[in-house]
Amino acid sequence: MDCVANFIEAKYHLAVAERMMKGYSKYPEKRFLIGVINELVRAISKLIRAFFIYENIKKGSLDKFLKKVAPKYLDDITIENLAKVIEIGQAQKVSPIEFAKGEKIILLIRGKYRFLTATRIDEFIKSFNTAISAFPKNFRQI
């Protein structure tokens, strides 16, 4: 796949995540927030692939992206939020306990309870929008 296709798929998954957040505001259920996290993880992985292709990096990893590629285009807060979303997405898949209380999701990750709020997930979406707009190609309007 080329750079443009990965970028378009990243924007698609972002749009799905944004629609799911709107759905959550109408029907506050845990599955919407979990869906938003999963869509953001997909979007971030597609955007990372697009950055690697743009930078002509053949074999990339998350660590390589965070240390070499991302600092060229993104601010520290955005980089931190993207890494946090991927970490949460991976942890959510293996978490033996996952439930919602109010607007919080509670996950058991490595023996510790972690709380994730809808507000924080919305911040992740905004950070990803920043990352999308920082992409160096001129096809952002797609």
Per-segment meaning from a language model:
Residues M1-F32, R140-Q141:
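Charged alpha-helical initiation segments
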Residues K26-F32, F52-K64:
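Short acidic alpha-helical/loop segments enriched in Asp/Glu that coordinate divalent cations
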Residues I57-A134:
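Long, charged low-complexity segments
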Residues C3-H13, V36-L40, R120, F124:
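Amphipathic alpha-helix face/heptad-repeat signature
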Residues E29-V36, V69:
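Short secondary-structure capping micro-motifs at structural edges
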Residues Y12-M20, E39, K46, S127, ...:
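Amphipathic, well-ordered alpha-helical segments in soluble domains
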Residues A134-I142:
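Short acidic DE-rich linear segments
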Residues L33-E55:
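Short, hydrophobic, well-ordered secondary-structure elements
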